[in-house]
Amino acid sequence: MDVRGTAIRSDAGLFGYERALVRRGLGPVAGVDEAGRGACAGPMVVAAVVLDQRRLGLLRRLADSKLLTERVREEVHADVLAAAAAVSTIVIPAAEIDRNGVHVANIMGMRRAVAVLDVRPRYVLTDGFAVAGLGAESLAVIKGDLMVGCIAAASVVAKVTRDRIMRSLHKRYPEYDFAQHKGYVTAAHTAAMTRYGPCEQHRLSYVNVAALAAPAGETRSLRLEDRVAMTSLRGVTETA
């Protein structure tokens, strides 16, 4: 069904998209988002969330995960789980990102996250770009994690899940201080890679990691999309 003519009031709030789709008989509606796309170490995590329209009152503090402090994000994560009809998370390890490229890995993760939801959505909302093969009609929403409740919920689930993984990896690889920078490009992270070399949790297809892995003979061929992505990420701190 073409929803381009669906009216969504500018003051409809964070749940306006979902409510408009449900009114047209297109519920349940799932939101999908990822965390860790821009990191050079650790996994990328994709989450899909279907919110129970009767429990939206539990989500008064819901917002894009990047706008929440770590403490509040953990609390909102619990709120999302209480308000959700279904939640799924897909963890995509660094080796899979190296093998497929970050964009393809992201798309594959989105498809898998939607496919394993306990509730089958009739419509899927994604953040920023369209994704084919989700098993339901879908719509990309620019700045969806700011504007759409189920996408914001997915962003929180993905972020909290990934941060917990990175804190766990910190215990195994304390020299890289993953608990602090979560695998993103920072001066301290680069200094640690320079001193110790990349570990198995680093994405060797990323330019900055490959350059430091080269002396150890670990260089892999780089996809064009990863070269472009990493060029734009040099010196950038966490954004996902």
Curated annotation (Swiss-Prot):
One Pfam family hit: RNase_HII
Keyword DNA-binding: no
Residue ranges of domain RNase H type-2 in the record: 27-226
Origin superkingdom: Bacteria
GO MF, any single term: manganese ion binding
CDD domains: RNase_HII_bacteria_HII_like
GO-annotated biological processes: DNA replication, removal of RNA primer; mismatch repair
Protein's recorded name: Ribonuclease HII
Catalysed reaction, written as an equation: Endonucleolytic cleavage to 5'-phosphomonoester
One GO term describing the cellular component: cytoplasm
Keyword ATP-binding: no
Places the protein is found: Cytoplasm
Cofactor binding remark: Manganese or magnesium. Binds 1 divalent metal ion per monomer in the absence of substrate. May bind a second metal ion after substrate binding.
Function description: Endonuclease that specifically degrades the RNA of RNA-DNA hybrids.
Broad class of enzyme this protein falls into: hydrolase
Homology family: Belongs to the RNase HII family.
Cofactors that this protein relies on: Mn(2+); Mg(2+)
PANTHER family linked to this entry: RIBONUCLEASE H2 SUBUNIT A, RIBONUCLEASE HII
Main location per the UniProt record: cytoplasm
EC id: 3.1.26.4
InterPro entries to which the protein is assigned, alphabetical: RNase_HII (IPR022898), RNase_HII/HIII (IPR001352), RNase_HII/HIII_dom (IPR024567), RNaseH-like_sf (IPR012337), RNaseH_sf (IPR036397)
